[in-house]
Every structure is written in structure tokens, then in C-alpha cells.
Amino acid sequence: MPRRREVPKRKIIPDPKYKDKLVAKFTNSLMQSGKKATAEGILYGAFDIVRDRFKEEPIDVFRKALDNVKPKLEVKSRRVGGATYQVPVEVRPERRVALAMRWLVTYSRGRGEKTMRERLAAELVDAAQNRGNAVKKRDDTHKMAEANKAFAHYRW
């Protein structure tokens, strides 16, 4: 591993409609095969559904959903003398956001609604109300960390 300087963080350009960096990041995590325009269409469509159906401001619902899905703890495998332990560690702030976005996208795709816009809107509203599969994933991650608290002294 080279012992050079730390790699500088890339500047994230805010999305054109909401002028928000988190929305731009979420668009990128929603994107498949480089189709950014499609991803933006899905996200903005989902925001419109949230505004129309649920009569709430979509950017507020989005932020609340992200906050509710962000994990505080996770487990990492650590090998000690032939045995592998699941060691609970605190999640770095950037990784919290990245995991929350990834889980929201993953569990939106797995829902039963017809279009991706509807699925994403439903998952965002559920997550904002502390329901849904993405929130369940966060709770499972926390439970796993809690169950393996005994191995916390193996942290590095």
C-alpha cells in the first residue's frame, strides 16, 4: 500500500432540480448501467408521488427516511487464532449515508408495486415513518452488533 498523501474527496455537484447533494448522491446510487437521466426521472417521479398522494414535502420525507435508515453500528469479521468473530464497530458518517441509500434502493426494487417510481415513493414514506424493509435491515444490523457485544474488545 503506497504511503502517499490521502486521496482528496470528489466534489459532488448538487442535483439540478432540488439543488441538494444528497439527492444527487441518491440519484447515482439508483442509476443502473450509466443511465442517469432514467434514474433522475424515477427519483423525481417518486418525489411527485410523495407530494401528490401523501401531501408531504418530498425532500423532507427523503431526509427523514435517510435518517431513520442510517445504521449506527455494524459487525465486521475479525479472525483471531483460527476463529472468526463478528466484531461490532461504529459506522463512519459517510458510510452511514451510503448504506442507508443502498438499502433504500435495494428494498425499493424488491417491493410489489407496479412501477419503480411507486416502489421508491412507498419505501421512502415507510422509512420516514420508521416502517419498511430498509428500517428492518437497520434494526437487524443493530441487533447483530448487540448480540456480538462480547467481542467488542477485538476492535482494531
Swiss-Prot record:
One of its GO terms (biological process) is translation. Pfam families: Ribosomal_S7. Keywords: Ribonucleoprotein, Ribosomal protein, RNA-binding, rRNA-binding, tRNA-binding. SUPFAM superfamilies: Ribosomal protein S7. Gene3D superfamilies: Ribosomal protein S7 domain. GO terms for molecular function: rRNA binding; structural constituent of ribosome; tRNA binding. GO terms for cellular component: small ribosomal subunit. InterPro entries: Ribosomal_uS7, Ribosomal_uS7_bac/org-type, Ribosomal_uS7_CS, Ribosomal_uS7_dom, Ribosomal_uS7_dom_sf. One of the primary rRNA binding proteins, it binds directly to 16S rRNA where it nucleates assembly of the head domain of the 30S subunit. Is located at the subunit interface close to the decoding center, probably blocks exit of the E-site tRNA. Part of the 30S ribosomal subunit. Contacts proteins S9 and S11. Belongs to the universal ribosomal protein uS7 family. This is Small ribosomal subunit protein uS7. It comes from Sorangium cellulosum (strain So ce56) (Polyangium cellulosum (strain So ce56)). The lineage of its organism: Bacteria, Pseudomonadati, Myxococcota, Polyangia, Polyangiales. The gene is rpsG.
